[in-house]
């Protein structure tokens, strides 16, 4: 879709029943759905300024507004919605499903590292919670079985290792290192 003439899309995955999830917006929660909200970089900038309040959370307030809209449209309690947000285009979505024995895992990933790739261990760590993040590679992992909190934490580590290896294999350099 569009907002203010700029690209804005939402990927929403509904669950048949509440699922224990881990989300960058909300942490561990019992979710009825998971979403990835994608807005054009200029949309984040302009709406971030429009949503800028006394608390200085422009982009975050814009994302929370969209998350609330989506929850209302789909008759979901916002607290039961695992949420992510990105400026990466959802047209850059990769979907892969693999099975092993009784386990099936589907991964939905969006990436936008052409102009905002930050490399841990190379670039200065300037991101602080509550300030505007510099970019994202969002990865949604869906399974057909319930994972314990410890298993979700282990899966997050494995996904991060895989993402790191993929960026190295693709020779994606930092766009910030001089």
Stretches found by the model and what they are:
Residues 1-178:
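Alpha/propeptide regions of enzymes that mature by internal proteolysis
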